[in-house]
UniProtKB/Swiss-Prot annotation:
EC number(s) on file: 2.3.1.20
Catalysed reactions, semicolon-separated: an acyl-CoA + a 1,2-diacyl-sn-glycerol = a triacyl-sn-glycerol + CoA; di-(9Z)-octadecenoylglycerol + (9Z)-octadecenoyl-CoA = 1,2,3-tri-(9Z-octadecenoyl)-glycerol + CoA
GO biological process, one term: biological process involved in interaction with host
Protein name: Putative diacyglycerol O-acyltransferase Rv3371
UniProt cross-references to NCBIfam families, sorted A to Z: acyl_WS_DGAT
Alphabetical keyword list: Acyltransferase, Glycerol metabolism, Lipid biosynthesis, Lipid metabolism, Transferase
Naturally occurring in which organism (per UniProt): Mycobacterium tuberculosis (strain ATCC 25618 / H37Rv)
Superkingdom of source: Bacteria
Pfam family for this entry, one: WS_DGAT_C
Amino acid sequence: MAQLTALDAGFLKSRDPERHPGLAIGAVAVVNGAAPSYDQLKTVLTERIKSIPRCTQVLATEWIDYPGFDLTQHVRRVALPRPGDEAELFRAIALALERPLDPDRPLWECWIIEGLNGNRWAILIKIHHCMAGAMSAAHLLARLCDDADGSAFANNVDIKQIPPYGDARSWAETLWRMSVSIAGAVCTAAARAVSWPAVTSPAGPVTTRRRYQAVRVPRDAVDAVCHKFGVTANDVALAAITEGFRTVLLHRGQQPRADSLRTLEKTDGSSAMLPYLPVEYDDPVRRLRTVHNRSQQSGRRQPDSLSDYTPLMLCAKMIHALARLPQQGIVTLATSAPRPRHQLRLMGQKMDQVLPIPPTALQLSTGIAVLSYGDELVFGITADYDAASEMQQLVNGIELGVARLVALSDDSVLLFTKDRRKRSSRALPSAARRGRPSVPTARARH
């Protein structure tokens, strides 16, 4: 038996008593070729799923094997109406997100989506966020592939490793400091969220119905921005997301403020960060640098193993409370995953695309997840069904945010400070001073 981490227990408790969808995440792989028969799928999935312990287990305070596991209770099969384009695929994804996972069974589902144009089909994996401590939905997809290599989406090698703590006394002192620190930070965030006027929140009552959309960005374009400014791909993604939400606020006639929007990021470990997105800045470079600096500061304050040292119920109650805040509290969960090390294949067929599905819950009106696959960085976006207009504004803003950064990453572009003095290249990391020309930018799939 394996225990939950403190943070994942909190995500599990975010499911409400009426069994609305809890914090579920997912990924969709678009596969070349005709969809296999149900018998073929059942044979392959049964063999591969049973090799992944979490997929045949249920949990309370720890993971235990589920008696009488039946694959057919977890697999759904749907066919898209003609023309089978991406708009129809996105509707099918949204439909899958509206269906809650059964908490009395292993917390995952697989949807086989047939009828995509171009002789293609798709497989959607949805898992509860409490399983993500062991694997993400993208990891699970990789484990189902022909090479069964769960490390296909493994973490980047440059991720900082947290050294183990020493004696029991230092561990206890660290535990106390972290508990007090995270409690204060989250309680402060909750207090601020409740006090924010509703007019500043991405709006309207939250429903169980969802919309899904994706924005694709050439990975070379993102790499050019990273190279120019000495930042990470995750920084670029968050800066683009910031522009997206700034666009929404301006479209509503609201003035973006420094405390307008906060995002919950679950890191590669078991911790979470709650940084503000700098929507108040119009300058895309200033936004990018602010995101980068805040991410670095959050990383220094919160080691990956932080919430594993936090008392279980304390952390669980915090996440539970955060999920129940009004919409203006936390309106987005931004997550990311590194690109796979090679192209994936399923039942002999090539995976053309992988689309991320952000954490989805009744209390969260908007979610964005970011995933790199092949030569693309993909933003997956979910929103309330009634928020179609604002979702399009968000998409447009993300596209604009990437386009502006790509344009500024060209060496022929001179960067100026606010008083029109040229920005010194010495202010940039060495990697930024070796910038390279930009390449074509974002495109949305509607």
